[in-house]
């Protein structure tokens, strides 16, 4: 897992997300504590449990983006789920145990890819040999291994010449016919509610039935090389060891991000049974507190999995969650609404800002977009004003405003090829004046 310091994590998040330092610090400390726990003596390590985080803030301020970026930094099994997709056991929908099963799948995939990377050089050599065996068949009476080791001498020289050409990419477009493992057919089984685990076992059992089939395929050498490297690497990886390490990794380092947690909170004044909502909360309790979940790879304990929940809490309040679940999220972080300065920073300072994206898109047609500082400031003001007058959808408002602003240029891009379009305050006002002044903005709301 990642050994980045909290300062390094926050610095990396700053490249993509503006403001929200409290939330960034909280997730950075939580991520660093995962690493710290691994350095503690084994007798005490088991007693140190993660402190789960609840992020509270309006939509479009960076809650989900923090989760997305954290997934790339964590170098640990990470899964993001929507709380609204789950229902109480017995109702139609996914049960919460599937969160852990999906996390284990991520861990297995991650571990397998890491192991395949380690044996990649050996796999590439084996793949090269298989391609060379097709290009230069062994001499009659000689085995494949004999040809590969260079006896007789003539074959060895030819193989060396072709190997050099192969590595230099001179043969990439040449077509060859090669034997490859055929993908096993996937069996789709409709699962009743609460029986996902049994369905997974049945699917696994059916997929293992029968012998591995191979068939000859005609491919360009470049494509064949990729497929052969994957096949050879898979042979060199110990699947049982992968499963064992993946289970341990999911248990000790796993991170689960639960989005839209407020949507399963029941408002006190609201009537109705709300069985499904409260049921999801009750089902989440043992998962967050620590329980054992059965997966197709084995049993997984959730005691040391870190849970980060987030929600806008527009209609409900954090106190509307059942008390037991509130207690499972001791760290609470409030994210603030975005200001005009934040909008400016989003447009100019982030690593892949909307300005850079639109410039790159139109550059493909020979149109140069030049945003002046005054133009960006005016754009930020308009986005902020529209948010204040209508629904506040945070940074997502910038996408609406930018699309409206550049609608004309995007449409006429082929005609404007070779020209430079300067987006200054006047340009912005000319196209968005009605948007910033008209009180009836309903048709511009996302």
UniProtKB/Swiss-Prot annotation:
It is found in: Cytoplasm. GO terms for molecular function: ATP binding; ATP hydrolysis activity; peptidase activity; proteasome-activating activity. Keywords: ATP-binding, Chaperone, Cytoplasm, Nucleotide-binding, Stress response. It comes from the Bacteria. The keyword Cytoplasm applies. ATP binds at residues 18, 60-65, 259, 324, 396. One of its GO terms (biological process) is protein unfolding. GO terms for cellular component: HslUV protease complex. It holds the Pfam family AAA_2. A double ring-shaped homohexamer of HslV is capped on each side by a ring-shaped HslU homohexamer. The assembly of the HslU/HslV complex is dependent on binding of ATP. Belongs to the ClpX chaperone family. HslU subfamily. ATPase subunit of a proteasome-like degradation complex; this subunit has chaperone activity. The binding of ATP and its subsequent hydrolysis by HslU are essential for unfolding of protein substrates subsequently hydrolyzed by HslV. HslU recognizes the N-terminal part of its protein substrates and unfolds these before they are guided to HslV for hydrolysis. This is ATP-dependent protease ATPase subunit HslU. It comes from Acidovorax ebreus (strain TPSY). The gene is hslU.
